[in-house]
Amino acid sequence: MDISEAKKISIVDYLENMGYTHAKMRRGQYWYRSPLREEKTPSFVVNNNLHEWYDFGIAEGGDLIELGKRMYNTNDIHTVLTMIERDS
């Protein structure tokens, strides 16, 4: 898998495959409890049309590659792509 292929993967589908379910959906945005930290109220939003996420609790966001870096705690793109391919 390369970066362009990874960026085509739906973040919503990816999170669902990882066992995360959205708490609500509003205006095409999917709200989750953050996969990056513990929280009670959903503040992690995914815009599936733009292939972007944003975590209001830590004021960070990006595409699936950036999410993979955070979830797998690495900046190594090869590792991130391998893990995304495995988990999607």
Positions of PLM-derived features:
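N-terminal structured subdomain of primase-like DNA metabolism proteins
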Residues: M1-S88
